[in-house]
Amino acid sequence: ILKKSDVVDAGALGFVLIIQGWLNSFQKSTKIQSHHLNISYEHSKIEALKKDIDFTITNKFCTECSIVGSNINRLELKEMVKNLGDSMVVAGTKDRVKIHIHTNTPAKLYKICSIYGKVVDRKVDDMTKQEHTVHHTGSSGISIVVDSGADIPEDYIDDIEVVPVRYSFGNQQHIDKVTQTSENFYKQMAIDSNHPKTSQPTPGDFSKIYNFISSHYDSIVSIHLSKKISGTYQSGVNAAKKIKVKNIEIIDSYNASVGLGLLAMYAVDLRRDGKSFNQIISMVKEKRDKTHVFLVLDDLKYIVKGGRLPAKIKTIADLFRLRPVIGTKNEGQLKARGVLWGRSNMESKFANFLGSKINNNFNYRIMIAHANSLKKGNRLLELLLKKHTNIKEHYLVELGGALGAHSGPQALSIGIQEIN
């Protein structure tokens, strides 16, 4: 039946072709040429087949981890996690168990696993992003990449590939914005004696993303945290040297958080408008000088614990009831950009401070990020929109762990970008 239907066992055929190639090489001392293989296919048929296949993904994240413990009850563990998703595999010994599952709630999985021992080797892949990359449509062969130090609204997240930043509370490891919600991150930060420590993506993390993208796109524009804040940019540069792709550019954003997010969104807009690879690079680099991020903290103890501020500065600020405004300056260096006096009405005082940064002769796109302080974020947005009619686009998002590890709960960050 298979022969009549012109169906071939692809694996077996591939093995036969390998053997044939070896024989030709040994017997004739000739290099194997692709035309010897006599393989062809009709591209239109492949594309038609892809359209006929249902790629609906019920559970978004391909999630893996290992549990290191003693006397791990694998049957009980299976019962605990089986309702979290599908494609579940639980295997190992009583001292070490490996889990694979497709789920929408990696954080729940890891929380259950922590009951049985130390959770290590965490890995989470967003399958919807992978599907979007594989089946992207349109004339653009340009992929936009950021690290998770960028805070980005839902409207844009599907159009951007993200290399994750990791953080840990003591021995408890997390993947930023994946294995723990921002809300739970700030709740834990407020009560955990272990201050969260962030770790930049490694060149290996970048290589994994770049290699996958390069099989589906011709060009990559990768925009990252300021190199004066993090080594993330350099990791991207190192990984890019080993990637086989037609065009790749690693850009220092001079920014963080929502500032970096705004630049990534701008790059997506340019791609949608049909701009070329070189045009996107040039225009993003020009726009980064017109994109600024500002951050006001509710409590300076977190930035002191994170090593970004001397303890004596906190002592002085607390004594005089001051709240410094921190922002990027000098091509991405975090610096004090101003001071808010008093502890009350932070949003109103911050809005007044930002008024001096918004020029009435230009239009703006802004994005506010809140650290488990949605009410404050909405209030700040309301004040700015009321006062500045030249704010043409606005977004409100949660502040991720990359910057939140230093800002602490109740902080507010804003990105301001001049637009045409």
Where is each model-derived feature located?
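Glycine/charged-rich beta-loop-alpha catalytic/anionic-binding loops adjacent to active sites
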Residues: 188-192, 217-222, 241-253, 396
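N-terminal accessory regions of nucleic-acid-interacting proteins
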Residues: 120-126, 130, 134
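Charge-rich, low-aromatic oligomerization/scaffolding segments with amphipathic character
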Residues: 105-122
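Mixed-charge interfacial surface used for oligomerization/domain docking
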Residues: 1-96, 130, 137-141, 149-168, ...
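Active-site cofactor/cluster-binding pocket
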Residues: 201-236, 240
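N-terminal glycine-rich anion-binding loop in soluble enzyme alpha/beta folds
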Residues: 143-205
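A generic structural motif
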Residues: 95-103
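Short beta-strand segments
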Residues: 18-19, 146, 222-226, 252, ...
